[in-house]
Amino acid sequence: HYIEFIRELSVSCRKKGLVLSVDNYVPAVYNRFYNQKEQGNVADYVIIMGYDEHYAGGEAGSVSSIGYVENSIKDMLFLVPKEKVINAVPFYTRLWTGSGDNASSRAMGISEATKWVSESGMDLTWDDSVGQYYGRLDSQNGEQQLWMEETRSLGLKMDLIKKYALAGVAGWRLGLETSDVWDVIGWE
């Protein structure tokens, strides 16, 4: 039913000269019923939401590690031509408090997270395995962890978009980024 809706919507959009893009979680077994391959046949663009690798209620980790993003792009390219694929990057991160099953998190925009790191005194160290800065801090609230999204990590994601010659980049969500992010995202 979903794909039939997208088919019908695409016809109406074309008649009105509108561009139709469809956002998707990264390709996975649990979301195959969205039929990204058929979306690629009927929509102008298929967007990969290249984030929420680790999410509220799940285990602590990066919102968008570089390996996760690259694997997501490769998986989508098996289904949809590169000229129609857009990768969305996060303008946010998660501050994780606690550990194991007791971990909780809150989403923070890049600008808010940058300020929080400065005020908390958390030391960040570059982690090549995730392509992000990582920090850990013991506080009165317990262990706090952060995988920081910022210009260097977003630059690596932009490199993947160029490497695979995708149609473009999208972001979640305007207003959460710092102004220097636009220097990295600038499309050539």
Summary of predicted features, one role per range:
Residues 2-117:
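Substrate-binding surface in catalytic domains of secreted glycosidases
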Residues 35, 52, 134-135, 148, ...:
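Compositionally biased, intrinsically disordered low-complexity regions enriched in proline and serine
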